Design a protein with these regions (language model features):
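Positively charged n-region of N-terminal signal peptides that target proteins for export
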Residues: 1-4
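Bacterial Sec-dependent signal peptides at the C-terminal "C-region" and cleavage site
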Residues: 17-28
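Short catalytic/ligand-binding loop motif for oxyanion handling, primarily in non-cytosolic enzymes
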Residues: 54, 85-86, 119-126, 183-189, ...
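Extracellular/luminal regions of secreted and cell-surface proteins that mediate adhesion/ECM remodeling
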Residues: 334-479
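Bacterial N-terminal signal peptides
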Residues: 7-18
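Substrate-binding cleft/loops of secretory-pathway carbohydrate-active enzymes
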Residues: 181-211, 216-276
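N-terminal substrate-binding region of glycoside hydrolase catalytic domains
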Residues: 26-152, 272-325
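An active-site-proximal structural segment forming one wall of the substrate-binding cleft
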Residues: 100-111, 136-178, 202-212, 216
Length: 479
């Protein structure tokens, strides 16, 4: 870090995270972004463990392998046919999703789901028992597609969604749930099937699926595919996406770099309705397939992240192969994807007295492309040399979700000037009372987390204490 005051003597005594130089009363520190990938809730790279086909792309990984060397992986995505999850009515094969899910959960990552109703690589995405009960379907080139308006199909869909919501809704380990039981591959389109059987569905049908999912998922983020209104229509606003937005449902663009430029994507304009309020999710084409057809372009992948203000981006291939071929652009994307909360400067007193107010002034900036939707509050934690917590000072006047989003190198930080008191005393007719608080010289750390001081968001600094707190320097507490 750089010292704000050019004092070589002070710099020599500086700690590893910051190079503060004391005035007679305060220290000012400018933390330096270490450039590393961050693993934080609701952002980063998504590893596709199942991409419809169960072998793609987690089947080559050992049971303990979470591909930790791929920087910025925060989520594992499980997209698979309904027929594999509920092969018999009401009898669920939870093992198929919970086994890989727990591998990443215990590594501190999140999970995301898409259960599909129609597939063209296997006989059917929908379980046979649904059709045996009388749900109408169409046969297309050997596979089955349900009539998405059929009341028997819709009832079975709702029972499945209800069962999944009971298990997963509101779990902080779940990043999002895709509305996948309408359309091919869970992508909300029938472009491959309607020309064959002649049946098409529109807004009224699509709305039913949004309503079913939002009825049961009250807390977890839901998304629809950008293909709901048409896979290659470049308009920004559609009736179905406006409706989804009104219900708190975001979009997932499933078609990045499927075709070469200028058709590398179609719906960046659509994303502008969503990203200010909820995360936008991107899926690039299967990496190998994109390369084979000449559509893969590293710079365009970064541009898509910028244009869509994307929070999450797929690893849609064998993860280590994609990493080796794209390490340079992955590192650059990691500096921008989602949110990247930076404290640009902080000034705090060298010495404070118990039961006496003081101020900490800090400048904060989000240097990612998307808001920190879950939010969080800055916290200053004072610890002794053994790591014991002496004081916790939360700045609830600044929520990082309110920090603006700017182009690289643009915009200005937000300043927060907050008054704190350590070991405040209260006096009444019975006497004066205050919590026990030691005096002496301590370390002061910064973090971002919940309103009572638990860190939840990784910051781009060295000097982590193991709990997402980052050392700024020292502070003395006196009587």
């Amino acid at each position: 870090m750089r010292s704000v005051i050019a004092s070589l003597a002070a710099a020599a005594a500086a700690i590893f995270l910051a190079a503060p130089v004391a005035t007679s009363q305060t220290k000012t520190v400018e933390p330096e972004d270490n450039g590393k990938a961050l693993v934080n809730p609701g952002m980063g790279w998504m590893l596709y463990y199942y991409s419809n086909v169960l072998d793609n792309y987690g089947s080559k990984l050992a049971p303990e392998d979470t591909v930790e060397e791929f920087p910025g992986v925060g989520t594992v995505f499980l997209r698979l046919p309904w027929a594999f999850l509920e092969p018999q009515k009401g009898k669920f094969n939870w093992d198929i999703i919970d086994t890989p899910a727990q591998r990443w959960i215990q590594a501190g990552k999140q999970i995301a789901f898409c259960i599909s109703g129609t597939e063209n690589w296997t006989r059917q995405g929908t379980p046979q028992w649904v059709f045996d009960e009388g749900a109408k379907c169409y046969e297309v080139n050997g596979f089955l597609e349900a009539d998405y308006d059929d009341p028997i199909y819709l009832a079975a869909v709702e029972h499945l969604v209800e069962a999944m919501a009971e298990r997963y809704d509101g779990d902080p380990a779940v990043s999002f749930f895709a509305i996948g039981l309408y359309g091919m591959w869970g992508e909300g389109h029938t472009v491959l099937t309607t020309p064959v059987h002649g049946k098409s569905w529109g807004f009224d049908t699509q709305k039913k699926y949004i309503d079913i999912y939002t009825k049961h998922f009250k807390k977890t983020q839901l998304c629809i595919s950008d293909d709901f209104p048409g896979h290659d229509n470049r308009r920004a606003r559609f009736e179905i996406t406006d409706y989804a937005r009104s219900k708190g449902v975001t979009i997932k663009d499933d078609s990045i770099l499927v075709q070469p430029w200028p058709n590398s994507w179609f719906h960046a304009g659509m994303a502008q309705l969503f990203w200010p309020a909820m995360p936008v999710i991107l899926e690039h084409e299967h990496f190998g397939s994109s390369v084979d057809r000449g559509a893969w372009d590293k710079e365009l992948l970064l541009k898509a992240v910028e244009d869509y203000h994307a929070s999450l981006l797929s690893i849609h291939w064998w993860p280590r192969e994609e990493l080796e071929a794209n390490r340079d652009i992955i590192e650059r994307i990691n500096r921008r994807i989602g949110y990247r909360i930076n404290m640009k400067e902080v000034t705090y007193p060298e010495t404070i007295r118990k039961n006496e107010s003081f101020h900490i002034t800090a400048k904060w900036k989000n240097e990612g492309v998307a808001p920190c939707y879950g939010g969080g509050y800055p916290c200053y934690t004072i610890k002794n040399k053994k790591g014991g917590i002496v004081a916790v000072l939360v700045d609830t006047g600044l929520n990082v979700k309110d920090l603006g989003v700017d182009a690289p190198g643009e915009g200005f930080p937000v300043t927060s000037d907050t008054e704190f008191t350590v070991a405040r005393a209260e006096t009444n007719s019975f006497g004066t009372f205050a919590r026990v608080c030691p005096t002496g010289k301590f370390d002061i750390f910064v973090s971002v987390g919940n309103a009572y001081g638990t860190p939840t968001i990784a910051l781009p600094y060295d000097g982590d204490d193991g709990h997402k707190r980052y050392k700024l320097g020292s502070i003395t507490i006196t009587e």
